[in-house]
């Protein structure tokens, strides 16, 4: 009976291999048109049915024999297994403004159709081919075979599945439509991994997130939080410079006991502080919840997890505390300037009164001299 089972398995294998040669990939911007052997390989992994139970498993895992260990190990693998299949994410903050309309017009064939009414970002999709040009059905259906770039109007660009050697080529697309380019870009790294057999919709890990399903909306959600985080990081660095500048002013006042800053310089510091808080709240939209996250709970879960992971609220709280310190110093320095102006006006008034008294004395002396004559 075992021989007949082996012959039947061999015939089934040959039939599947022959039928797979007639299959072609459907047209997609991210896959080539080479024939696929993915369907055959998937069928070959099915168990050959028999009336007699087999004494040993012919599978690499024990899921078919009734054991749940395979599913448990699938979720919690070794470090090597966890690193396998990760899609790298690179977040950049390279300018203070990006013309999204011009960028969209130039890369129209790569634009991912929007799923929300938000106009402060665009998502671009680029093809990615394997060296052999052969894909399985699972690979064709996954967005992990494409490169994505999510660009935000306030200056952030998030790259998905882009190698380090290709980063500059993608960022050049952004630079052509950017204004206020920074001399030194801000950068952050993250990763995402797709596990269709994951029990939950998502699971967090060290410096990466595991999703049950990775789609373009997930990419948008991840990009929005990372874009806000890297922009917030830039704003914090700018505010830190202002704090250090005011600290130098206070140290100088402690040593000399005088305040020598000009009114123009103080107004410039006030403008920098106000523009930083306005950019974070209005342009970056730090407190504006994504429309995609409003519609579906699984995207909301990703959104909330990443905001907690990147400590968005806590970091903004620290930024707000530093801005309040700056605001307190500005009010103090303004009072010092006003007092200095008041002192100057008082001295001017005293000088004018002295002149008036001198003129009065002169007239009295002159009248007295005329009367004596």
Swiss-Prot record:
It comes from the Eukaryota. Predominantly expressed in the root meristem, in the primary and lateral root tips. Also present in leaves and pollen. The chain crosses the membrane at residues 346-362. GO terms for cellular component: mitochondrial membrane; mitochondrion. Pfam families: DUF155. Disruption phenotype: Reduced number of dividing cells and slower rate of cell production and endoreduplication, thus affecting root meristem size and delaying postembryonic root growth. Decreased expression of several cell cycle genes indicating a defect in cell cycle progression. Extensive vacuolization in mitochondria. Residues 1-49 form a transit peptide. It is a single-pass membrane protein. Required for the maintenance of mitochondrial structure. Positive regulator of cell division and endoreduplication but negative regulator of cell expansion in the postembryonic root meristem, thus leading to the promotion of root growth. This is Protein RETARDED ROOT GROWTH, mitochondrial. The gene is RRG.
